[in-house]
Amino acid sequence: MRVAVCTLLVVLLAGVALTPALAQDNMAYAPMAKAKFGNLPVIPKCGTLAVANGDPTKGAAVILIKSTTGCVIPWHWHSAGEQLMFVAGSAKVDMKDGAPVRMHTGDYINLPAKNVHQFTCVAACTFYLATDGAFDIHYVDKDGKEISMDEALKAKAPMKKAPAKGDMKDMKM
């Protein structure tokens, strides 16, 4: 019985360990210099993007995004989780349920699915955004009610937020 249980555990753990490797079985190379940037209708025009890998309309993808200084993507959430890896510039990511995070060149942040946040590019930003599912964006008002991008861009009221917990840039890793 013990042998059967141990064998089952080994098989299950091996399957879990191999799943990410099997998810992408082709090498991908996307030189930034050759990226073709364009606007996306659901993102303010101050942000442009280029797909580095995958198809963001269908599933997991890596997107290269450039934003101008002062660009704000108002309060929103995504159905998929996302990871941001900063290449250049700096930004502030406000969190509905936490302290704002200041991002700088070389920084990384993981945002789980449906995490309500707002992105402000403090100095011209370039970063990679990796999603674990199809890309979408749901803008919300200060009470968390879903609204259009135009309404979100016009809104001036701050989001009702949880108490600040400190700036993550000061954390030791």
What are these regions (language model features)?
Residues 1-4:
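Positively charged n-region of N-terminal signal peptides that target proteins for export
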Residues 7-17:
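Bacterial N-terminal signal peptides
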Residues 73-75, 93-94, 111, 116-122:
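Short beta-strand His + acidic residue motifs that chelate non-heme Fe in jelly-roll/DSBH
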Residues 21-61, 144-173:
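A short, N-terminal "cap"/entry segment at the start of jelly-roll beta-barrel domains
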Residues 55-57, 91, 96-114:
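Short acidic-glycine-tyrosine-enriched beta hairpin
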Residues 58-78, 110-113:
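Conserved short histidine dyad/triad with adjacent acidic residue
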Residues 104, 113-137:
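Ligand-binding loop in jelly-roll beta-barrel domains
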Residues 68-71, 78-97:
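Glycine- and acidic-residue-biased ligand/ion/polar-headgroup-sensing regions
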